[in-house]
């Protein structure tokens, strides 16, 4: 009977040890995994204004977002954008409400195109800054950040005449912003 009891005990110990090891592997794999479809926070990206060129009185630029090292997140196809200063200049989005999201990770980029006119010096205004509201405040790791991304406007004056006083914004696009 002693042999039978020892075999049962050994089998029970091995069963419990195997279950514990399997549970450890499963929870370790789950804890290390991050969601891949998580909206970006301002802390997960660097942002900058990129000059895109000029022609026939029009100006082009972009707001470029680059994922920080080790970060993966998704930017919606349309993001809320506002101007600081230049009270007669409006923003108008050409992005469809259902524009596709763009995933960025580990140094990859996405941008929002901007277009405006800069003719008529007596009726021009220069914004102080442009702000974008990130879609998320808390990262998958639990880090929180202010959702507002404020970029100083360094792209010169914008037409503020009533007939042409709008900066048009486009949908979030994968890749680096085009430059001249």
Where are these regions (language model features)?
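Low-complexity, acidic Ser/Thr/Pro/Gly-rich terminal tails and inter-domain linkers that flank the onset
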Residues: 32-55, 175
């Amino acid at each position: 009977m002693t042999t039978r009891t020892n075999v049962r005990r050994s089998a029970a110990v091995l069963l419990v040890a195997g279950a514990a090891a399997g549970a450890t592997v499963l929870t370790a794999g789950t804890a290390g995994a991050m969601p891949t479809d998580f909206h970006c926070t301002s802390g997960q990206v660097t942002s900058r204004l990129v000059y895109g060129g000029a022609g026939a009185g029009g100006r082009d630029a972009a707001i470029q977002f680059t994922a920080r090292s080790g970060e993966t997140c998704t930017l919606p196809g349309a993001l809320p954008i506002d101007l600081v200063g230049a009270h007669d200049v409006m923003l108008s989005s050409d992005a469809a409400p259902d524009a596709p999201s763009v995933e960025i990770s580990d140094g990859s980029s996405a941008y929002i195109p901007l277009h405006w006119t800069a003719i008529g010096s007596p009726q021009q205004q220069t914004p102080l800054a442009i702000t974008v509201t990130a879609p998320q405040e808390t990262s998958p790791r639990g880090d929180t950040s202010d959702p507002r991304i404020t970029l100083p406007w360094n792209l010169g004056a914008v037409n503020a005449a009533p007939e042409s006083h709008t900066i048009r914004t486009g949908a979030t696009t994968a890749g680096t912003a085009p430059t001249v």
